[in-house]
Amino acid sequence: VGTMEDFKHLTDEIHKRGMQCILDVVYNHTSPDSWLIENHPDWFKRDAQGNTVTLVPDWSDIADLDYGKEELWQYQIDTLKMWAEMVDGFRCDVAPRVPVEFWRQARREVEQVRPGAIWLAESTEKHFIKFIRSQGGYCATDSQLYEVFDICYDYDIWPSFLHYVKGKD
């Protein structure tokens, strides 16, 4: 941990050495004890009892953000623009669970602060996409993510790629 001054010093030193810094950002969810839950309770998906929820059973320790809220979009974009003053790009955790249109708007606005910023999406596997969609949730494919991101993990096409290189149909 450290201060913003410490982080600025770190990124300045990274840049002095001819390197770039990509920041990992998590915009699909927060921890259940995030100050955002207390200060912006309407920004989260909730069950009938009002409890924060996630569509992924294995992720019981998170609270999914609700991108149906315009104020959330601007808050998230403002934080990206703030970080873009110091970093050269973003690795976006669980990017497919955040609407591609959000990423498109975020990229447009960040470009004003950091032209040429690098955008890396952690994508998901095909079975995960199918599961989330079967639960009524949003989950983009790699091809949709490539509309906005420079680089993706390509999880959803990996099995097809392996079959191809191994000479299988």
Language model regions located:
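Substrate-binding/active-site clefts of carbohydrate-active enzymes
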Residues: 1-84, 106-112, 129-130, 152
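Active-site-proximal helices and loops of the catalytic beta/alpha 8
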Residues: 15, 88, 93-169
